[in-house]
Design a protein with these regions (language model features):
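Catalytic core of the metallo-beta-lactamase
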Residues: 1-45, 103-167, 193-200
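Cap/insert and terminal regions of metallo-dependent hydrolase folds
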Residues: 2, 8, 46-47, 75-78, ...
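Short glycine-rich, polar/acidic loop-and-turn segments at beta strand-coil junctions
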Residues: 17-18, 37-39, 44-48, 70-71, ...
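Active-site environment of divalent metal-dependent phosphoester hydrolases
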Residues: 21, 50, 71-75, 95-98, ...
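Short, surface-exposed connector motifs at secondary-structure boundaries
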Residues: 36-39, 57-63, 204
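Active-site neighborhood of phospho(di)ester-bond hydrolases with catalytic His/Asp-centered motifs
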Residues: 43-44, 64-70, 89-91, 144-146, ...
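Short, hydrophobic/aliphatic alpha-helical segments
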Residues: 52-57, 198
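Active-site HxH/HxHxD metal-binding segment of metal-dependent hydrolases
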Residues: 55-114
């Protein structure tokens, strides 16, 4: 069975191993986007297995390795070691956390030159947990969230953790912004301004690192997910 799954024009996704954080087990997902020059943009990389590497190499050469927020860094080192010529991009806050990694560039509001016109991006700042860079792949109409929007399978939690997951809106019928992220925004005005840019994208799908992708009525889903911020 193939590791990479087609998710639209020039975009593929791959699942990785579950990651344990404070006793909660999160499914993981990465995305591979092929740019117009044939090079690849690797978003939120999962563990690099031999099978995954073979399939990625068959698509094209890796140009960019991207960590979308300061929490998604576990596998950056092995990807950079395997692809030393690729540009390793740091989100806000990650350089201080991972001083052992030699980052080549920093993510900011607005696309980097390497993918301008193909992938747009917005930084949602002012969150005490992490500042997240949200991306939009124009060719497939896909919005890519990392942790701001998520959903974990109910069967991955039990006992008191299941109760916490329900209260945190992590196991609902559709992906949502967990309560902990909602309350961690210290500058909601800045968050709303970033959100308005996201809502202006002609979204067709929403992809996230933890949760079931949304492939229908993406604009409606985004409005529901962030109604707590706009209402």
């Amino acid at each position: 069975m193939a590791v990479l799954q087609d998710f639209g024009p020039d975009i593929w996704i791959a699942g990785g191993p579950n990651v344990a954080v404070a006793g909660f087990h999160y499914p993981t997902r990465m995305a591979v986007i092929r740019l117009s020059d044939g090079g690849l943009f690797i978003w939120s990389p999962v563990r690099l297995t031999a099978e995954l590497r073979t399939e990625v190499d068959a698509i094209g050469p890796i140009r960019h390795i991207v960590a979308p927020n300061s929490l998604h860094h576990l596998f950056l080192g092995e990807w950079k070691q395997a692809y030393p010529a690729a540009v390793l991009h740091a989100p806000p806050g990650l350089r201080k956390r991972r001083r052992d990694l030699a980052f080549d560039a920093d993510l900011a509001d607005g696309p980097s030159a390497g993918w301008a016109g193909q992938i747009d991006q917005v930084v949602m700042r002012g969150n005490l947990i992490t500042s997240e860079v949200v991306f939009f792949h124009l060719a497939s109409g896909t919005v890519l969230f990392t942790d701001l929007v998520q959903q974990i399978p109910a069967d991955l939690v039990s006992g008191w953790r299941a109760a916490i997951a329900r209260l945190d809106l992590m196991v609902g019928p559709e992906p949502s912004v967990p309560r902990k992220f909602r309350t961690a925004f210290t500058n909601r005005r800045a968050a709303r301004e970033a959100l308005q840019r996201i809502l202006a994208w002609p979204a067709e799908k929403v992809l996230m690192a933890h949760g079931t992708p949304v492939e229908q009525d993406a604009p409606g889903f985004l409005r529901r997910a962030f109604a707590w911020l706009t209402g």
